[in-house]
């Protein structure tokens, strides 16, 4: 499915979204600092194994100036301290996520003095180059070596983080089994799609309420 499709346009650009629902991560765009947005999107991508909803993204965005989301500070805490503050802040997720986040903060602090923006620049602000770099840095940036989570993360950085990435449109993810049936309703037969398409399918599957055209940005919705 092309990025110019009606589904993607409604999800990403239309004021009405999909039955009023938009990309749940868009609340991060309200944070003024680019570096803070990148911190938020990075932790969100780590937590987002099953797509965070808008409420969880908004709660995360409200913590944009907390030390947990500042790698130069978080890197010098201990893994148990990270877990304790996540629990205190009611950031839900498996306990191992705390150690993963701690390792990632230590990695970006050690290599780029805690700056995700510098990591992006060092890889020419190129999505394909960044994916290769992350795949080769599994110990330093655990989980981001995986092709799906790295593609989702880079998609968020390009669309919401405020950093334009070259070759963003070439990112792909494998459709998860639960999205295949939904994808077929939109004529998608490919096994791999752009992460933006996958995110749009996820939101459509939970938001479609067969609302009239004036309440939804998707023309020709297969749910009607």
Description of each model-found segment:
Residues 1-224:
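HhH-family (HhH-GPD) DNA N-glycosylase catalytic core used in base-excision repair
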């Amino acid at each position: 499915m092309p990025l110019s499709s009606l589904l993607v346009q409604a999800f990403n650009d239309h004021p009405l979204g999909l039955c009023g629902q938009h990309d749940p991560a868009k609340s991060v765009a309200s944070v003024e600092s680019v570096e803070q947005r990148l911190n938020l999107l990075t932790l969100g991508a780590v937590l987002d194994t099953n797509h965070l909803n808008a409420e969880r993204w908004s709660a995360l965005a409200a913590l944009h100036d907390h030390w947990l989301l500042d790698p130069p500070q978080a890197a010098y805490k201990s893994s148990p301290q990270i877990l304790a503050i996540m629990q205190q802040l009611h950031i839900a997720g498996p306990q191992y996520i705390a150690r993963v986040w701690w390792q990632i903060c230590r990695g970006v602090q050690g290599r780029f003095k805690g700056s995700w923006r510098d990591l992006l620049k060092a890889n020419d602000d190129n999505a394909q180059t960044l994916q290769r770099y992350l795949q080769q840095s599994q110990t330093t940036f655990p989980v981001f070596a995986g092709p799906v989570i790295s593609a989702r993360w880079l998609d968020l950085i390009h669309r919401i983080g405020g950093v334009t990435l070259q070759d963003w449109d070439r990112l792909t993810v494998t459709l998860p089994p639960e999205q295949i049936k939904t994808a077929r309703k939109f004529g998608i037969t490919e096994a791999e799609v752009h992460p933006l398409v996958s995110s749009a399918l996820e939101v459509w599957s939970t938001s479609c309420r067969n609302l009239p055209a004036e309440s939804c940005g998707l023309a020709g919705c297969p749910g009607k």
